Amino acid sequence: MTDTIYALSSGRPPAGIAVIRISGPQSLAILDRFTDGARRGKPRRAHLRSLVDPADGDVLDQALVLFFPAPGSVTGEDLVEWHCHGGQAIVRAVLDALQRQSGQFALREARPGEFTRRAFENGRIDLNEAEGLA
């Protein structure tokens, strides 16, 4: 797996909070790009950061940003989570901005179940656990 994937991991908007997950080898570079080079902070801890659209520099939202280094993440890969406001416009703007970065990174939207598949393939969950999530 050389590509990096992203998806809305929480329920569909509108909601109070939306969780957008990014997993793969370029997830930390994407985090740096969207936080305009702000200091990452410590792994596994939430940090308040502005999410900035790399295309035009517009602030998309203020979000809690977390990163989980491989191999200790849920997928076994470098993983980033953005906990942003769950309104439809904000979620769509963030997902659209990620899509626009697919030319800069080996980045694409995750297929259904792909985070689980990567967790299984990287030994983070066994077959019984994977089937339990289906």
Stretch-by-stretch model annotation:
Residues 1-134:
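A glycine-rich (often HGG/GG-containing) alpha/beta subdomain
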